[in-house]
């Protein structure tokens, strides 16, 4: 998918809280919005090059969103609103082979008391619930999730198991918001409960998928599957 708004390069200064960061743009220090509540400590380092997306909204306090950063030569998109859009595009274009038979794609649909990112349906009326997780944490080609504890993430996985036991298809797709990934693993050192929930889901028939992206400052597209090590 293309990023239509104007983007600019800047220098990262600091991040006082989850939603705000200070950057230096054309010699001026200013506050920007960070559309990611994760820690991103391995990415947002002082003086690293970041990418800003201009937001033309007069009601906002900040003019820019910080949507990505360079970790050495690797560009990583950190916008938490991007993964669902990228996966929707991939589902529509039949890029996720195991889900290609589903022609109806509905966003943000409920199952009992749960809300999943996607509800898919094929011509035979078979229903599949899909949850998407964006991944920004990487070390030497190994991607991990989460980069901060997430009770909500573990809850989603257990709810997918309930959907599977009720006769529906169910899966979780981890989207690497970067390229050149050798494998994906749950980040047990950060959140053991999530790792246990992911393995529990897999044992109980929930599909676990991982895909990397072709990504640059103006676009991000799902490309190929990544090896999963649980």
UniProtKB/Swiss-Prot annotation:
Q: Which organism is it from?
A: Clostridium acetobutylicum (strain ATCC 824 / DSM 792 / JCM 1419 / IAM 19013 / LMG 5710 / NBRC 13948 / NRRL B-527 / VKM B-1787 / 2291 / W)
Q: Which family is this sequence assigned to?
A: Belongs to the SfsA family.
Coiled-coil region list = none
The Gene Ontology terms for molecular function here are:
DNA binding
InterPro entries from the UniProt entry: SfsA (IPR005224), SfsA_C (IPR040452), SfsA_N (IPR041465)
Instruction: State the NCBIfam families in the record.
Output: sfsA
Q: What is this protein called?
A: Sugar fermentation stimulation protein homolog
């Amino acid at each position: 998918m293309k990023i239509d708004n104007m983007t600019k390069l800047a220098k990262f200064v600091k991040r006082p809280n989850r939603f705000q960061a200070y950057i230096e743009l054309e010699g001026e220090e200013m506050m920007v919005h960070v559309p990611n509540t994760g820690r991103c400590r391995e990415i947002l380092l002082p003086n690293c090059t970041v990418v800003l997306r201009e937001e033309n909204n007069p009601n906002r306090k900040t003019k820019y969103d910080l949507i990505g950063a360079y970790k050495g030569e690797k560009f990583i998109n950190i916008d938490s609103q991007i993964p669902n859009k990228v996966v929707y595009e991939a589902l529509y274009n039949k890029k996720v082979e195991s889900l290609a038979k589903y022609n109806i794609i509905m966003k943000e649909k409920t199952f009992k008391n749960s809300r999943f990112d996607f509800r898919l349906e094929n011509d035979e009326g078979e229903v599949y619930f899909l949850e998407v997780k964006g991944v920004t944490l990487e070390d030497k080609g190994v991607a991990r999730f989460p980069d901060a504890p997430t009770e909500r993430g573990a809850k989603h996985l257990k709810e997918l198991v309930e959907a599977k036991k009720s006769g529906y298809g169910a899966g979780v797709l981890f989207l690497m918001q970067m390229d050149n990934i050798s494998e994906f693993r749950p980040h047990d050192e950060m959140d053991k409960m999530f790792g246990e929930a992911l393995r529990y889901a897999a044992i109980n028939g929930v599909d676990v998928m991982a895909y990397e992206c072709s990504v640059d400052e103006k676009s991000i597209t799902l490309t190929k599957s990544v090896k999963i090590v649980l």
